[in-house]
Each structure stands twice: as structure tokens, then as C-alpha cells.
Amino acid sequence: MSDKVKRFLSHPLLSNRRLLLGIWIILSLAGMLKFHRSYNNFLIFKGVYWHTVNGTSLYAAYPTEYRDVNHYGPLFSLIIAPFAILPEWIGMLLWLLFLSGWLFAAIYWSGLRKSQQVYIYWFCGFTLLTALFMQQFNIAIAAIILSSFFLIDKEHEGWAAFFIVLGTLVKLYGIVGLAFFLFSRHKVRLILWLAVWSVILFLAPMAISSPDYIIGQYQEWYSSLVAKNTENIHSIAQNISLLGLVRRTTGCMNYSDLWLILPGMALFALPFLRFSQYKNLAFRETILASVLMFVILFSTGSESSGYIIALTGACIWYTVVPWKRGKWAVALMVFVFILSGMGNSDLIPKWIRHDYIQQYALRALPISILWLWLCYELCTKDYTPIEKVDADE
């Protein structure tokens, strides 16, 4: 990152993790402002537990309970269980604290230097609040992907496999953790643990239901995701991605997203051919940043709250490289913060927010530019450390 940003964030007050934790707790409390107006997502999540216990469909509509339908896997019933059995306001408050705490801890226990962690805490705070207002699990997905990477990097394949499988069986996004497989020093061990955790976590919801019910719900989940993907393509609230950006700005609807997804996957995979760079932590961390952005840019299910994932990736891209970022990188991060981070905020005039940002999925634009820049760097730059970095930074 630039020297000015580093000096600013190194101030004892701004870099105090206890203060930052306090701010994130306050943001969680602020998320409760939606309790008396719109906490529909929490009601859906709560319903996942109770419908599992009662043996009713997890993917049917229950208009007397909540709007919309659930799209999370049966395993989610166990994650939400401690919060679902409490009175609604207590359950929702603890849920928001749980989500914020999980991501805060994942960043804290990562391999990122303190200065990099502090940058993420500050930069992503506003986007975190947006996700908290929606009570969304995307906050935890960011934590799961981070944990998958750094646990593999620290040779804790067993726990890395746990988080990869957990994220996959809850919201599919976790499967991107498999992208870090090539960085593992114990690939056979990782494969074995993936198999073990897949069996354990697949069976786990049966503890509060039955085998036939859970197997049936996984089948329903697949069908619901296929149907949801079709709906997302034309939804204003969904597909806030590179796919949606291209579709809405061009006005062309009669083509397959594979025309964008396949080149995107090729560009994403190309840096993995640079085997000589694997030894450089900055290279591997930039791959992590690419994964965090790719999962949002190339998913029709990308929604406003998902940008906590992409912005975490943007912060990692900006801070981990061994060279100093220039003015263009700083300008791009400002663009990311304003449009991708605040694009859904009431601080943006309503007519701009609704008629342009939302209508054309413009929140994806800065992240798309940044990701393309990132891919270019991954394919051309040398990530060998050029200076010794203080371990306390």
C-alpha cells in the first residue's frame, strides 16, 4: 500500500484492534435498526431450523412466515439453530454479532500483517454494515474463504477442508476454496480430509431430522438453485456482477452467460501456471484476492450484501504486493469504496442509486476493472519480496 496510507493507519488509535473490534460491535448493534422494519432474511434463516425439525420442505414458500424462499443447504439448519430457538430480537442480535465476530476473527487470525488487517477493518466497515442490515451469511462466506486459504498456507489441511466443505454445503460459494489446492504441501492429506468432512457434514443435519428427509432436501436444494439462477438473470436485486453489468448495459438478453464465464475462468486459471511464483506469499495472497472477487463477478446470485466478499479481496490486492502502489491504484480503490462499497447506501442520491447503479449493476464495475488489473499483474509481475517487512506491521 502507499506510504501515506500506511502512516495514517499506523497511528496508535486507528490501528488499535480493540477499538476496531468495538466499532464492528457497534456496527452489529446498528444492524438491529432493521429489526422493526425489515428482518425478513433472519426469519427465513430461522425457518430453516424449524422446518428441518418439523420435516417440512426447506424450499417451499411460507407467505405467513416470511417473504421469498430459502436457498441455503440443509446444513445451515445447524448453524442457525442456536439463534432460531431464542426470542427473535435476541436471536437476531446475537446472529449479527456472530457474523461480524467471525469475519473479524478470520482476518485477525489470518497470515496478513497487522497493517493489512487494519486496512481491511476500516475499508470494509461500511460494506459490513450493509450486509448486517440484510442479516446476510455472506459475511461468514468471506470469513470461510479467508480461513480456507490461510489454514492451507499454515499446513492445517484438516481445518481448511472443514471450512471448504462447510461453505459448499451451505451456499456453494465455499467450493472456491478448492482453488487453493495447488498451494497445499500435503495434497493427499487435504483430499482425505475433504472426503471425511463431506461425509460428516452431509450427515450432520440428520441429527435433528432423518436421513430420508435430508437426502430429499439436498435434491430439492439443487432444483431450487437451478430455478433461482434463471430468475437471477433478470432480477434487479440479484446478478450484481460482471455478468449482470454486461447484460444490463448492453440490453442484450438472448445469450448464454458461458460466453463470459468461460473466458473469465481461463483468465482466472492462467496465473496458476506460474509455478515459480508459488513460493512467494504475496503471489498466493493475490490469488486469494482474485478468488474473493471472482466468486462475486461471475455469479448470477451476487447481491448487495455479497460485496463484503469482493471488497475484502480488493483490500488484499492493494496491500500485499511487494512493490508500492501508485496513484492509479489509490484512485481505483477510492472508486471501489464509493461505487462498490457505498452504491446501495442512502448517502447516494436515490435517483442515481435506483436509475443507474442498481439498474445497470454498476457496483460491479470498479471490482471488474480491479480484477482485470489483478489478473494482468498475476501473469506478468514478480512477487519476490524486495524488502524486509517489520513483522509488527
Task: Please identify what each model-predicted range represents.
Residues 2-159, 184-304, 384-389:
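Primarily membrane-embedded glycan-assembly and transfer machineries that use lipid-linked glycans
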Residues 104-108, 145-154, 176, 180-184, ...:
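Hydrophobic transmembrane alpha-helices
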Residues 141-142, 161, 212-219, 304-312, ...:
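A cytosolic-side transmembrane-helix exit/cap motif
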Residues 164-182, 299-309:
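Transmembrane helices and adjacent periplasmic/lumenal helix-loop junctions
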Residues 169-172, 200-204, 339:
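Membrane-embedded alpha-helical segments of transport systems
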Residues 303-318, 364-366:
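Hydrophobic/aromatic-rich transmembrane helices and adjacent perimembrane loops
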Residues 318-393:
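Aromatic-enriched
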